């Protein structure tokens, strides 16, 4: 079994943990590869371009926070990912630093559970070529630096859903419901729910609210504006600047992200501890 390791190279503690992991793997004669940037930061030779790691590795290890896990998931495709939290929030990363070796041992023994997470798949035609992007959390279209408020036109299965003026629109999976969508007023959705949520960003109408839809729906969005360029972001990474009238199609991806589960974690407890969900405020505490 070969491990593909992706590290948040901007965190000293993540790099230190990666160095410790190398020693642990070598002592057990286990094969591993780092992505090129991580390998350079750690000064190790066992490396591969991250785009090729999926063909060489059986299991991925993400050392960082939720952002590192999201980044890793774009290249792991359907391979299992062990998420180790070396960040601040750690909402998606299943294991703490102290639990890392135990999690790897379970994978080696085959005694682990997988949490399948739905992805979004976005398509857009660019110069007669169809571009494809995926997102574990969300696909977001924003007004960017456009000085006026554009109109976002939305269709579901070729039927008009709405057209409203706003600063942007978020299409999120159940996994991504606790990310940008939540900050924009969207609902918390349990991860295994087969739904998406469409959340407006600062809409210009009080009647516009987030809407939860079945994840078998096909969503089409375009920006109605006389000019301008509008950022298309997938999991926080800008993929393209959309022109007015360019249609972005979003649907459920056939490829699931497979996260190695920490069976000691409970989603309700995570909401309380990570998001302080429903906690009573007690002055002085």
Curated annotation (Swiss-Prot):
Superkingdom of the organism of origin: Bacteria
Record-stated family: Belongs to the NAD kinase family.
Disulfide bonds: none
Source organism: Chlorobium phaeobacteroides (strain BS1)
Any one GO BP annotation for this protein: NAD metabolic process
Cellular-component GO terms for this entry: cytoplasm
EC number of the protein: 2.7.1.23
InterPro entries named in the record: ATP-NAD_kinase_N (IPR017438), ATP-NAD_kinase_PpnK-typ_C (IPR017437), NAD/diacylglycerol_kinase_sf (IPR016064), NADK (IPR002504)
Cofactor requirements of the protein: a divalent metal cation
Protein name in UniProt: NAD kinase
